[in-house]
From Swiss-Prot:
GO terms for molecular function: identical protein binding; molecular adaptor activity. Present with 9424 molecules/cell in log phase SD medium. Belongs to the SGT family. One of its GO terms (biological process) is post-translational protein targeting to endoplasmic reticulum membrane. This is Small glutamine-rich tetratricopeptide repeat-containing protein 2. Keywords: Chaperone, Cytoplasm, Phosphoprotein, Repeat, TPR repeat.
Length: 346
């Protein structure tokens, strides 16, 4: 049985890990190998911590890469020649060079990410995409770089591109969920993180589950907030209605000018005003009269004069007498024409 791609990748990661642990390479070299191991494990869909388990179940039976290569080097030359003649070359040379170039650019981007040089990382991933635009990993990595710079709109676009290229690539949904959550869209983030769990199934890590639970909690908080807002609005409407005057009487002082506000405290005038407002056409009459230039000029004079005008002066004002006659239908007021006084004189 031939080894799977995952098992071969695990062999490589295991080999790099042993070199780093034994300090057989410089610190800069160790950093580069750590980035490489992250990239390889990400590309083949396994965690670095799972390498020993993968190799233990494989046909390699815990062998290291160096042991396997050393065993192969001891194969007789005649057998090597026969094997070489039977190998089919399925990858065109141009394609292999293209992939190698794109992977090198991606590695440079990953190294820039490790150094927190996110702008450089974006540039390198962009170059890799130009070389090989069909690789979902490049878009997902660039989405992570954009999110690190809080450029969440661009991160969403790259994550969606990764998903469209490879719908089974869980990191595309993971990057999308992170960006959507940062944008304040927990419902969409929850949907993306749910997709991650669906794809990974039993292989889902604790980090993936935490992301999902965080988005779920945010959605629940948002729903609770939306539920309380209408209740607060209803309370505000009740308070506003309680602030209106008895019987729905409008603020005539405000309607006719600030100077008349004090007169509205007179009980007799208030009683007359309430009686007037029982007439359905009263407000229409008031609005019509306010279009009269003389009455409007009178109201503006009260508003600009400040204070409450003298009642005797008001009743001697022809415009006001005319307005009262129109509102009260002649009761308690005289029109401005020459109509005689019909009351009995003592």
């Amino acid at each position: 049985m031939s080894a799977s791609k995952e098992e071969i990748a695990a062999l490589i990661v295991n080999y790099f890990s042993s070199i780093v642990e034994k300090k057989e390479i410089s610190e800069d070299g160790a950093d580069s190998l750590n980035v490489a191991m992250d990239c390889i494990s990400e590309a083949f869909g396994f965690e670095r911590e799972a390498v020993s388990g993968i190799l233990g179940k494989s046909e390699f039976k815990g062998q290291h890469l160096a042991d396997i290569l050393n065993s192969a080097s001891r194969v007789p030359e005649s057998n090597k020649k026969d094997d070489a003649e039977n190998v089919e070359i399925n990858i065109p040379e141009d394609d292999a060079e293209t992939k190698a170039k794109a992977e090198d650019l991606k590695m440079q981007g990953n190294k820039a990410m490790a150094n927190k040089d996110y702008e450089l990382a974006i540039n390198k991933y962009t170059e890799a995409i130009k070389v090989l635009p069909t690789n979902a990993i490049y878009y997902a990595n660039r989405a992570a770089a954009h999110s690190s710079l809080k450029e969440y709109d661009q991160a969403v676009k790259d994550a969606e591109s990764a998903i469209s290229i490879d719908p089974s690539y869980f990191r595309g949904y993971s990057r999308l969920g992170f960006a959507k959550y940062a944008q304040g869209k927990p419902e969409e983030a929850l949907e993306a993180y749910k997709k991650v769990l669906d794809i990974e199934g039993d292989n889902a890590t604790e980090a993936m589950k935490r992301d999902y639970e965080s988005a779920k909690k945010k959605v629940e908080q948002s729903l609770n907030l939306e539920k309380t807002v209408p209740e607060q609005s209803r309370d505000a409407d009740v308070d506003a209605s309680q602030g209106a005057s008895a019987g729905g009487l409008p603020d005539l002082g405000s309607l006719l000018g600030g100077g008349l506000g004090g007169l509205m405290n007179n009980p007799q005038l208030m009683q007359a005003a309430q009686k007037m407002m029982s007439n359905p056409g009263a407000m229409q009459n008031i609005q019509k009269m306010m279009q009269d230039p003389s009455i409007r000029q009178m109201a503006e004079g009260f508003a600009s004069g400040g204070g409450t005008p003298n009642l005797s002066d008001l009743m001697n004002n022809p415009a006001l007498r005319n307005m009262a006659g129109n509102l009260f239908g002649g009761a308690g007021a005289q029109s401005t024409d020459e109509t005689p006084d019909n009351e009995n004189k003592q």
